Amino acid sequence: MHLRAKPWATDWLAAHSDIVITQGRATEQIGQWQKLFAKAQPIHVEIGSGKGQFILGMALAHPEINYIGMEIQETAVAIAARKSFDQVGELPNLRYIYGNGNGVETYFEKAEVEKIYLNFSDPWPKTRHESRRLTYKTFLQSYEAVLPEHGEVEFKTDNRHLFEYSIVSFMNYGMRWATTDFTLDLHADAEKVIGNVETEYEQKFMAKGQPIYKIKAHF
């Protein structure tokens, strides 16, 4: 969903370039992301971080991990970064990229990222837009290029068609997962929901009684 532009967004991002890295700067940061954090720790990336509820929640819950939220919409990334800054200041383990998630290998080198999150991505339902889905094979190639051997992609969605499509895409690419890392109704499973950090969309769909599909797949 495209957000209405906020008049303050551009100036705020420019004033907080230590927190939000633009796409151009991100490509220059390849292999050096640990320098932007307080200390070297595993890096987890959310592609399509929206207004940032998930990535902020994860950064607060896991100070032992460095998190990067990647978002293409200026308004969304500005809202996310300002919200976290206003709530808790500059977190030592949270940064954002204002840029396109297409081609993450231009931002990170091999094994620089430990894990990738895809949360409630645009389903792009029309067949002619298949290549835009974040679980399409070319995206999987990009993820594999920055993750370590057997690196993990965690995917959540409310869209059954996109979930089924993604399962097939993962399988065709040779990815694998344990039966315990797969669910067709996340919030109906007391064990699987432990440690789950909800996104804004997740809360919205839960309120409507819609099931949330989730899988953690490995290369």
Curated annotation (Swiss-Prot):
Gene3D superfamilies: Vaccinia Virus protein VP39. The keyword Transferase applies. It catalyses: guanosine(46) in tRNA + S-adenosyl-L-methionine = N(7)-methylguanosine(46) in tRNA + S-adenosyl-L-homocysteine. One of its GO terms (molecular function) is tRNA (guanine(46)-N7)-methyltransferase activity. PROSITE patterns: SAM_MT_TRMB (PS51625). Its EC number is 2.1.1.33. Disulfide bonds: none annotated. Pathway: tRNA modification; N(7)-methylguanine-tRNA biosynthesis. The active site is at D122. It holds the Pfam family Methyltransf_4. S-adenosyl-L-methionine binds at E46, E71, N100, D122. GO terms for cellular component: tRNA methyltransferase complex. It is an enzyme of class 2 (transferase). Substrate binds at K126, D158, T199, E200, Y201, E202. Keywords: Methyltransferase, S-adenosyl-L-methionine, Transferase, tRNA processing. It comes from the Bacteria. NCBIfam families: PRK00121.2-2 (NF001080), tRNA (guanosine(46)-N7)-methyltransferase TrmB (TIGR00091). Belongs to the class I-like SAM-binding methyltransferase superfamily. TrmB family. Catalyzes the formation of N(7)-methylguanine at position 46 (m7G46) in tRNA. This is tRNA (guanine-N(7)-)-methyltransferase. It comes from Leuconostoc citreum (strain KM20). The gene is trmB.
